[in-house]
């Protein structure tokens, strides 16, 4: 099911009160290489969901001990996936970090921190559906499996899809742990 030569990263970020002035955001990441697993989490005040999604990936990248890795990233963030898979960042850099609408790119600091890792490693990005109930009716889960394969343009085994979904849910739990920890005095 898993390729022991591929470093898999599962990430999630979330924000309670997203876009409000007094919100809390959390992020979670899981790094998996063969049988070795490392879980990371953290939180910030006055942030956004997108920043937490990006922070999860950045902290996962920072935890990698050596360069030249073959990495598969699994995330439910359309923002992250679209940027990397459609190479938005290339257009942004060419346009002086402006969007197609001539506005400054949001979260530029995090994008600039993430981009060097693309040069250092061979990275593939896979979009997953977030917050999946693993006890869903079989037909609903099968539809999610078909959508997952369609989104990613390749076939995964059903068992692999279940495993990836479990890991994505765990990354979400880690993000919530981060939020809970920052709430405590």
Cite the ranges covered by each PLM segment.
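RNase H-like nuclease fold core
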Residues: 1-51, 62-63, 84, 136-143, ...
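RNase H catalytic domain
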Residues: 14-19, 58-168
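Short, conserved alpha-helix that lines the donor NDP-sugar binding/gating region
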Residues: 53, 57
């Amino acid at each position: 099911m898993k390729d022991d030569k591929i470093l898999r990263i599962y990430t999630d970020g979330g924000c309670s009160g997203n876009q409000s002035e007094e919100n809390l955001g959390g992020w979670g990441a899981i790094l998996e290489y063969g049988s070795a697993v490392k879980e990371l989490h953290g939180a910030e005040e006055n942030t956004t969901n997108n920043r937490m999604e990006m922070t999860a990936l950045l902290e996962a990248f920072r935890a990698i001990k050596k360069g030249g890795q073959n990495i598969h990233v699994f995330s439910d963030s359309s923002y992250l996936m679209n940027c990397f898979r459609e190479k938005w960042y290339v257009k942004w850099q060419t346009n002086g970090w402006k969007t197609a609408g001539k506005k400054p790119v949001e979260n530029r600091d995090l994008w600039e921190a993430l981009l060097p890792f693309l040069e250092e490693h061979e990275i593939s990005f896979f979009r997953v559906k977030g917050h999946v109930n693993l006890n869903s009716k079989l037909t609903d889960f099968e539809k999610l499996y078909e959508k997952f394969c369609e989104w990613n343009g390749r076939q995964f085994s059903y068992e692999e899809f279940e495993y990836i979904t479990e890991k994505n849910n765990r990354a979400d739990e880690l993000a919530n742990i981060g939020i809970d920890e920052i709430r405590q005095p």
